[in-house]
């Protein structure tokens, strides 16, 4: 009996822990883990297959092979448990101890651990302050290192070759100094380090030195040494004296059939180490010559290196099959390593997979599960039921019963499955809607049935897709699956809050067809009393679906909510002019929605809006029911409509021939011009591509116009146009299938095709698919098609990698509190570009929390108080009262440490309410950005040719009526003709309405002519400014006579004759094409006043100097009188090289990796006045003198165009040299808010181009994570090192601690890290190691003696705990609270006991004596 009880004891309680620490193991520690030394390289005996004693699989060291049975068989069974057999020395216990018992090898010579040697930066090198090369020479016995110089002039840790050593021995005599080779030498050096003293020394040197490089070097070394000091790890432990041996079950040797064995590579590696070690021991005993011993020691070092990390140094060790052996390091790193394969990617019990088919009869929360699959998945539940019902007495009997599939089993299965949700998953699971829970409905057959409306979320179709089924087993799991994951509870996309259950294809077509109207349909103009009358008329064929009729329709308006919160509705009957189809459809409308939402043709977008409105007005349940009804009606009506397409539906426009002929003629004209040398080949190509592009568009337009309308006769007998009922047009117009571009290929012309490299082939395909392609045309079109397929494959991999990096950087961001109480936020405006509103203010602030009160601009009353979550009604209100800027909370300015607060995040888009505590918003953000990644292009766009020419604007006009206002940055001068010429680079014109609210804003480029004044009232359509689109002018801001400097023909400028006009102009030559002597000269012009003095910039003593950049055409002569606003030179924009803009996925990755772009813009570091200093070789020197008179210098490459000129006042962060912005500069000069604006806008631009909607807050969450580290500037009294990078929350905690003690806090600068870098530099080493660069991360963590607090999700998954998010957050909080209270209780009890013992001690004694007497 006792034995049985002991068995129960063996199931150990898993330990509760809050952190995991990693460190270096001392030799003593390794010996303490070990159960014995492995002395022989043998594994198992080839005849008996029993492990050899003292070998790598020794049962004495590692434990028995069979449960409770010693090796020789003397002791068997449980009763001998714990006995150690005296014959074979094996302890009688469970065989699974062979998974946990370790052995060790006593190394005859110490060896260095390769990770600390070779993983860059070399940790050994840092501690010893030696170069890696030197240490390697010592370790591999090529050089000596001085350990103890004694009285000689040698220095400690000096390296010398063998010859040197012998020479020095002769010089100073043997034994006067100690020098050693190999790991022993390094170990002695490490032992000799006095860490405390070193730290003091370095700190002193840090204070003293001024050089940047030295500070960096010292700081690095200091960090490592302080880590050693703090963690109590001794540096000499980086050298191994004892090698631990992995438990044998983790490096198994398994017999294959045919007498061969398969073994883990580790056994080979261990065997090599043991062989060499034993040989070395023997050589040392034999007192072999030094050179032989040295060689053996080197080989031992190499063997140990290979075991730890094969191939890290020198050639990798290979096995019998010439393949490099897989070492310990390879076991844990990479996709197939321990972390990603086994800890983060586990396989799941109780799962199955099958093909999916459509289940049109299912409700939204159901799925069809094949009976056989369900029987297998729910087996344990069925067994249990069979036993409780008494049908089967044992599990074995129950199994038999189930396998015979008797009717009673099916009944039980029905019962078991009732209300037990299952989870369906479709790979790739790109966002949280890729796994949803459904209630299973048992079906015959072998395919899973899926509801059509959830296909959009799963991105599933029925062309052979497969899905996996998982069964949640525990009650908690079932409950969570039902409440959080049930398909009917997930009707919105978490990425943007739009409904995910939108009908598509057939359903859309059916609904569209039903809600279209037509002129002069059967029964037009009839009036009906109610909908049943309409249905009766329709069934008797008195009216047709699209006929326009009048019907009395009952709508239900929301009156109020009663005590239970149920809505009360009041019916309202109105006569509506509508169509038969819409009236019939209105029967399924939920109460609370007006009929007007249906009284229009329902295209896909409209249906999406309809479901969205239903969700916001009527709630989740009604919406789901409504969506299901829409689906049923749509299918039914699509079937009734009987829409089909025939070749005749593709109408080829009659104008096509003419358009193509005209285009061909134009192309011939250009060819002629090219032949006669008037245009270059590139220009000809650009124009040809342009012409064909335009022709294709024209044909397409003509075709759409023809498809779109048809002529019909109305009731008066007149012929009128109405929207066409052409099947193809209806499909495209409704959004059911196809698009205008696809129809254009069917019935217009296919147009231009691209080569695989993305360049456009200049001969277009003039045919369409209806006419058919000839062989050449077919061949050209295969190009593009093939590239498309190759692109898709690449895109998927790249997109997946981006998602992985995003998830990794945000995985620990969870909503941990409701409100952090910050008063910071960001001011949101509508997004306007080129005068067009791209994103309205209402869309940007929906679902955010206000920071400040929103004030009605007309009455100045508070319309919405601070701290309000803006829902649809409130943004509508903001829109109506005309507020154009709202300050809202943002994840970026949230003050919560180690997480986010609900108020800063705002609405949980997937649920439509304020986010709950415990929501893993980081992962959701990562998924929302990564999931549409596959839809983005891989292309880098070539601007140039067709693309750019269409986009060049040369004027800007107002779209709204209002008043013109110029921004503060706008500067302009009036020229001789009285025109206003803009001389600012970043000026904008705003147009405001009567209340002074901004309606639109336009950038006005430098050199433009303004046609309006500041404060002028204008009508819509008024031109605001015009400019020359093809050249960029250089405008004079002063009046005077020109005086050229360095403008020498044939040196800095060249004369160009215009062939057509015969006029000559001077063009500035590229510095690279000049002779060496003249390279540094800049052509420029100064202005002289009437007295011949140089014109100065007002308020300074700088002369006005205007530099001409390369390629500028100088339009004035030397000594010419110029006026303010006159053009001095023009720079042709055509001569700017065609830039590649990175688009699509690479651009998103570039932004999130925070890469500095090539040729980045230079921004002004300070606010001040500019002037040019003396030029250096190939560089211009720009000086900005700030307001205090300090000069800041910039060196700018000669060929760059400097946007400022002498004496101009620039603001901090203003662009000085054109180019793409560098996010790091934006952060440094303009702050976090500007940076976030920049990244959000840039990322959104890429997605918007593809028509993907992502909410801004997801991108902000990622930016928050990119900004989570700071760099220490001034240490104050904190524990940090100058220039150290630390987590923001860690710094704030430390500063709080220091301030509380009344000391000086540290100051810091914000750091922007790319997502890969941010993931690797996270405080959790477990998370970082499982992401990338496993070796480096673990090496660093071990030396630092890091502790992982298991804050993020990933670390907890890896150690196998509940994640601290969702329901797990509450669990962990409760657990921590419980532990704290238990600790307090224990302490209280201890104190109580103590107090009892102290005071009444004598009394206790007395009573004892008394008792004794009585006894």
Curated annotation (Swiss-Prot):
Name the keywords, alphabetized: DNA-directed RNA polymerase, Magnesium, Metal-binding, Nucleotidyltransferase, Transcription, Transferase, Zinc
Query: Which Cys pairs does UniProt list as disulfide-bonded?
Result: none
Which prosthetic group or cofactor does it need? Mg(2+); Zn(2+)
| Co-factor remark | Binds 1 Mg(2+) ion per subunit.
Q: SMART domains recorded for this chain?
A: RPOLA_N
Q: Where does Zn(2+) 2 bind?
A: 820, 894, 901, 904
Reactions catalysed according to its record: RNA(n) + a ribonucleoside 5'-triphosphate = RNA(n+1) + diphosphate
Q: Which domain of life is it from?
A: Bacteria
Q: Which GO MF terms are attached to this record?
A: DNA binding; DNA-directed RNA polymerase activity; magnesium ion binding; zinc ion binding
Where, in this chain's numbering, is Zn(2+) 1 bound? 70, 72, 85, 88
* Record's GO cellular component terms: DNA-directed RNA polymerase complex
UniProt xrefs under InterPro entries: DNA-dir_RpoC_beta_prime, DNA-dir_RpoC_beta_prime_bact, RNA_pol_asu, RNA_pol_N, RNA_pol_Rpb1_1, RNA_pol_Rpb1_3, RNA_pol_Rpb1_3_sf, RNA_pol_Rpb1_4
First-tier enzyme category under EC: transferase
* Residue sites binding Mg(2+) per the record: 461, 463, 465
Enzyme Commission number(s) of this protein: 2.7.7.6
Q: What is one Gene Ontology biological process annotated in the Swiss-Prot or TrEMBL record?
A: DNA-templated transcription
Q: How does it assemble?
A: The RNAP catalytic core consists of 2 alpha, 1 beta, 1 beta' and 1 omega subunit. When a sigma factor is associated with the core the holoenzyme is formed, which can initiate transcription.
Matching HAMAP family: RNApol_bact_RpoC
Q: What does this protein do?
A: DNA-dependent RNA polymerase catalyzes the transcription of DNA into RNA using the four ribonucleoside triphosphates as substrates.
Which family, according to UniProt? Answer: Belongs to the RNA polymerase beta' chain family.
What name appears for this protein in its UniProt entry?
Answer: DNA-directed RNA polymerase subunit beta'
What is the organism lineage in this UniProt record? Bacteria, Pseudomonadati, Pseudomonadota, Betaproteobacteria, Burkholderiales
